[in-house]
Structure formats: C-alpha cells, structure tokens
Amino acid sequence: MKNLLVYVNPRNNFSNENWDNENDLLVKVQIDNSIELGWKPEDIMLVTNFPYEYSGVKSIEVGDENYCSFSCGTPTKINVILDLFDKGLIEDDIYWFHDFDAFQMEEFDVDLESNKIALTNYGITNISKGHNGRWSTGSVFFGNRTKDVFDLIKWAVYKYEKNEEVALLALTRHNKHKILDRIDRLNITYNFATRRRNIVEQHKITELPIKVIHFHPFDKRPVFYLREGQDNIGVCLHGKNPMDKPLVTERLAKTFKRHGIA
C-alpha cells in the first residue's frame, strides 16, 4: 500500500491564507506518524508543486496547473491523482490518499479490488441527515484501475464548479456510468471527523479502535455543538467532549506534542 499526501498551492510552499505556515508542521507530523506506524519512507508519496524533503521522504513535484482555483482548492487532489496516473506513477498497488488533517492512529490493511475506490460518508453530523450520507473525500483508498472514476469526478467538478464531494454526490445520486459499482463504502473508522459531528452517536457506529481521526489542530472554531473554547485540540487531545476522554491515541498525542501541538 502507498500513503499519498497532496499539497499544491499557488504560493509554492506550505503556507496558505487560512493557516499561514502551520501546514509545514502538519506535513512533519504526518510523515513522523506514518513512519512510527510502520510505513517505509519510499511508500509515502508526498506530492507538491515545490521541492521538499523531510525524514527520508522527498516530494514528487507536479505542475502548478493542477491547482483548482474554486471550492477552496479542494478538487486539486483529483487533478493531482489524475496527473500521477498520466505520469505512470500509479502502479499495481492500493493507494491511500488522505488530507493533511486526517491522521492514521492504527495499522490497517484494506482489501480493495483494483478497479474500485473506497471511502466513508460524513458519519453522524449535527447539520442534517442529508449530510450524513454525503461522501467524504478526506480519506480515499483506490486501486490502479480507477483512472476513469477520477476522470468522471473531475468532469463533474468542472461542469458544476463544485468541490469533489458534491461532484461525487451528483454522480452517485443518479448512478451515472454505473459509478456505484466502482465504489465501496467504508466504516467511519477510516475517517472519523469531529467538527459538526455528534461524536457520541458516531462513536457507536465506529469499528473500534478508530483508525483515522480527521480534525485540524489549528482550527480554533468551537466544535459545532460544544461551548465556546472547546475546539479541536480540546475535544480530540484533551477529552473535552461528551465522552470525557481523548479521541487520539497516546502515541499520536506525543507526536503532536513533539511538534509543539498540545
């Protein structure tokens, strides 16, 4: 399996208008965390549009044209994955793409056919039941025969000028090109997000222990249903949640602390 991280930015570095240079810390957390969990540096694919190297992981550089200028740039991941296909860098293996704020906590091995992608829904939100079933692309597994699936998603992204989650929802709602035959829905354990989620109810449907937790440690907004001040760090690292316990493992918490995130 390959561990895929993507960061393409018009500034050609790890800064952006929301988080300044904090993503430069997160990439180090991601690489250290992955190596601690047994990933070899050569199996960690960090794709950027600028040179970067850390702890034996050297970035694969792609062009600035992969950046998507709308929807906060999130469809960029689709463009980059397709670029990797075009460059012959997607080989006979399973690939795990995940956002910079989706952190693996346990070792896993996903059984997936080479012509399929696998991802979770949104879990149990405090937004609406309609959001619960929406696809979440923050953690996606895919095989080496899925280029046509990503081509379809890209087509829908640019047709509707919406992000890749909305595009995928549009495709699957009407099962265009029988796309549902190419998608496996995973348990929320592979993408346990916290903000705007009913953590207690979501935890009940999670295959424990949580394998991937999805939260941005630098997002200081209150988690939707909690009181002011109970942000992602408080909820996930310090147990300031209705379950009264941390959601991250002690090992991952130590990795965060080593990088000044606590």
Spans of model-derived segments:
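A structural signal for well-ordered alpha-helical segments within the folded catalytic domains
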Residues: 25-28, 75-79, 162-170
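Hydrophobic/aromatic residues located in beta-strands of well-ordered beta-sheets
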Residues: 43-44, 95, 183
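Conserved hydrophobic/aromatic beta-strand scaffold that supports enzyme active sites
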Residues: 80, 117, 139-141, 185, ...
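Conserved catalytic core of nucleotide-sugar-dependent glycosyltransferases
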Residues: 105-170
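Catalytic core and acceptor-binding pocket of nucleotide-sugar-dependent glycosyltransferases
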Residues: 144-255, 259-260
